[in-house]
Regions:
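N- or domain-start disorder-to-order transition segments that initiate the globular core
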Residues: 2-63
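A glycine- and small-aliphatic-rich helix-loop capping segment at beta-alpha/alpha-beta transitions
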Residues: 83-93, 115-120, 233, 254-264
Length: 286
């Protein structure tokens, strides 16, 4: 096993061609090693920011099991690196850390099938791109044409995707293809700050920024004919993939609660981790 020094002085022990270890001895207080999955080529990109430092910080978390893991897509994030993975044991002081999930509540990707074939649109691609940029607000500070009242915002929190279907923005089939039919029971709108509601009021129907996207795709290969047939997928079919989240609304909710949990760092003796986005309560805290 060889050892390399990174530009930020983080020691990396090479386990094999695809795994690297940050020893728990790197920082006093680390409960486990850091384990990075990457080859030499990816490692050069990973060296470009302080994501490895975040891998080490996560290793401080109470109840963490086995190792602080980093997947090949690792890059700088909130508390955890993006691409960071950790499991905590609730019977051993395990915690819940918002930084481990990210601030963009309910961020995810949806693949939507259309009734079009590539031949239907191939001569209209430029017009399609212009139309999408014109009709779909995106980017930092973008605001949508969908205006909602304070009451409607609370309905969105409780009903989830069902609210969008009721407004004509989706179909019942969309709900059937969504986890928990688009809404997990138990949402409490009164637990959300007015500041969060203010930030979210003009952002319904917008795409956001960063790595969020709306992409028109074409099926060029099928894997598992029976499964594809059951989903109504065929070669040449046009699909739309959407990656978005809850924008400033979700960010503000998370930020509010992260700040409220700041005292937990000292309460649970996690003084070595000063990065605020790793604030946390234990799973059994009240």
């Amino acid at each position: 096993m060889s050892e390399e020094k990174m530009p930020d002085n983080i020691p990396l022990e090479k386990i094999d061609d695809y795994r690297w270890r940050i020893p728990r001895s790197y920082k006093p207080g680390m409960r486990v090693d850091g384990l990075i999955y990457a080859d030499e080529k990816l490692l050069k990109h990973i060296r470009g920011d302080k994501a490895l430092e975040q891998v080490a910080n996560v290793a401080f978390l109470p109840g963490i099991v086995n190792a602080s893991l980093a997947m090949p897509d690792i890059h700088w994030g909130y508390g955890f690196p993006i691409g960071g993975v950790a499991a905590t044991d609730p019977e051993n002081g395990g915690v819940v850390s918002p930084g481990g999930v990210g601030f963009d509540i309910n961020c995810g990707i949806r693949l939507v099938k259309t009734n079009f074939q590539y031949d239907d649109i191939k001569h209209k691609l430029k017009d399609l791109v212009y139309a999408l940029f014109s009709d779909v607000p995106c980017g930092v500070g973008s605001k949508g044409d969908i205006r909602v009242t304070s009451k409607e915002e609370k309905q969105i929190l409780v009903k989830g995707s069902k609210w969008a279907v009721e407004q004509g923005f989706g179909t019942e089939e969309d709900l059937e293809c969504t986890e928990e039919y688009g809404a997990i029971p138990g949402a409490d709108p009164d637990a959300v700050s007015e500041r969060a509601y203010e930030r979210g009021r003009a952002q319904a129907g917008t795409l956001g920024s960063g790595n969020h996207f709306l992409e028109v795709q074409v099926i060029d290969q099928l894997y598992g004919r029976e499964a594809c047939d059951s989903l109504g997928l065929n070669l040449g079919q046009v699909m739309v993939m959407i990656h978005s989240g809850s924008r400033g609304f979700g960010y503000q909710i998370c930020d509010d609660y992260v700040r409220s949990m700041m005292p937990c760092l000292q309460k649970y003796g996690i003084n070595a981790v000063s990065y605020t986005h790793l604030t946390l309560p234990t799973i059994y805290s009240v």
